[in-house]
Amino acid sequence: EEEEVDAYFVKVPVEKVFSEPEQDYAQRIADSLKRVGVSVVQIEDFDCSDEFLENHNITKTELSSIITDFLGKLTRKIVDLQELILVSVGGETSYKCCHSLDSKNLQLIDEVEPAIPLCLDYNSQWVITKSGNLGNPKTLINIVKYLEQHK
């Protein structure tokens, strides 16, 4: 049985991560949060081939850092436009997004699923972090359902 959640998907071409996040992305996501309630940002055309890395004169580690920096900056722009509950996937992504929001101390409020915390920072910013390789194919859907049940 396949479960679905209404969500707005924003696919950002990997080439865009080499510059500042465009305000258009932030505005589209903020608007979609008002309409749909769930927005997903995904880096598309993610090519980690040796050729891609050579063409950009970077290593895999540097590309990963560039992507997470971009996502952190985009998160800041979105939060400036719209209140939200941040759900981030991946340790480095979570760190960069929280850092961009100045969320240095997170207080554990609940556990959405095993090892997936619901936290609150001193600015009343809600944050859910999920390790990149933790969970199963339904984990993100379960997080959305948890949030819907606890509105």
Feature annotation, model-predicted:
Residues 1-151:
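Active-site catalytic microenvironments in core metabolic enzymes, especially phosphate/sugar-handling
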